[in-house]
């Protein structure tokens, strides 16, 4: 596929795109594949807390990241990898300048890097006028990371396989206090650990007929291992569950605590122990990126 460059109204315009966080309301590991990847059953929900990517499509072919992230080589940055991947698959002659306002923590389990990659793929598909389908973009995204497809599809979903088989589900859009202790956790470290649970029984489909998934019927298989290895996470979780239902997201280190109102979440935030970073956010069953893309598509 070759992207269109003639009469492209998006060229040389700086356009902002949200790159939202996600939480895993539960994460069950139901097996391990021969290729080393794990078969999961997890429920993704977005939250209204996002990085912001600014992209400017250019007539020159270069891919430029104007705001490098400390400690991450540009060649290893998922933002750059995603742009290069789409450029190679589309055979476009166009380029892009990208900057990021990064507010999502790294090593937190909120999917920030995967979200950044997905936003780049979806945004450049529009700005370069490549016309790949969401399914095609998801296949590209999966090569960058297992969480990338959910951010491309843009709806809350029950995910199976490595996280790429998605079924739309609408959990309640609760308010959450998102907390992070003073540590970061490597996803690879957790998923390669010998004592990680890998044989959780698959869910009966009827178990999904609810809107509240932060109950004892669901759990995060990574959490038990993480609290053994990271006392900071263990201490934080023990404190939070005294107030409201709390669970680690992804492989951590972030923990979400569920509330029915913004005021309740803010009230507990004010009581947090020192050294804990935090923010309050609402669950979203539709990614804010979808709305931005829809508006821009109408303006072409």
Curated annotation (Swiss-Prot):
<feature type="active site">
    <location>
        <position position="22"/>
    </location>
</feature>
<dbReference type="GO" id="GO:0005524">
    <property type="term" value="F:ATP binding"/>
</dbReference>
<keyword id="KW-0418">Kinase</keyword>
<dbReference type="InterPro" id="IPR006204">
    <property type="entry name" value="GHMP_kinase_N_dom"/>
</dbReference>
<dbReference type="GO" id="GO:0019288">
    <property type="term" value="P:isopentenyl diphosphate biosynthetic process, methylerythritol 4-phosphate pathway"/>
</dbReference>
<dbReference type="InterPro" id="IPR004424">
    <property type="entry name" value="IspE"/>
</dbReference>
<comment type="pathway">
    <text>Isoprenoid biosynthesis; isopentenyl diphosphate biosynthesis via DXP pathway; isopentenyl diphosphate from 1-deoxy-D-xylulose 5-phosphate: step 3/6.</text>
</comment>
<dbReference type="InterPro" id="IPR014721">
    <property type="entry name" value="Ribsml_uS5_D2-typ_fold_subgr"/>
</dbReference>
<comment type="function">
    <text>Catalyzes the phosphorylation of the position 2 hydroxy group of 4-diphosphocytidyl-2C-methyl-D-erythritol.</text>
</comment>
<comment type="similarity">
    <text>Belongs to the GHMP kinase family. IspE subfamily.</text>
</comment>
<dbReference type="InterPro" id="IPR036554">
    <property type="entry name" value="GHMP_kinase_C_sf"/>
</dbReference>
<keyword id="KW-0808">Transferase</keyword>
<dbReference type="GO" id="GO:0016114">
    <property type="term" value="P:terpenoid biosynthetic process"/>
</dbReference>
<keyword id="KW-0067">ATP-binding</keyword>
<dbReference type="GO" id="GO:0050515">
    <property type="term" value="F:4-(cytidine 5'-diphospho)-2-C-methyl-D-erythritol kinase activity"/>
</dbReference>
<dbReference type="InterPro" id="IPR013750">
    <property type="entry name" value="GHMP_kinase_C_dom"/>
</dbReference>
<keyword id="KW-0414">Isoprene biosynthesis</keyword>
<feature type="binding site">
    <location>
        <begin position="105"/>
        <end position="115"/>
    </location>
    <ligand>
        <name>ATP</name>
    </ligand>
</feature>
<feature type="active site">
    <location>
        <position position="147"/>
    </location>
</feature>
<keyword id="KW-0547">Nucleotide-binding</keyword>
<dbReference type="InterPro" id="IPR020568">
    <property type="entry name" value="Ribosomal_Su5_D2-typ_SF"/>
</dbReference>
<dbReference type="Pfam" id="PF08544">
    <property type="entry name" value="GHMP_kinases_C"/>
</dbReference>
<protein>
    <recommendedName>
        <fullName>4-diphosphocytidyl-2-C-methyl-D-erythritol kinase</fullName>
        <ecNumber>2.7.1.148</ecNumber>
    </recommendedName>
</protein>
<dbReference type="Pfam" id="PF00288">
    <property type="entry name" value="GHMP_kinases_N"/>
</dbReference>
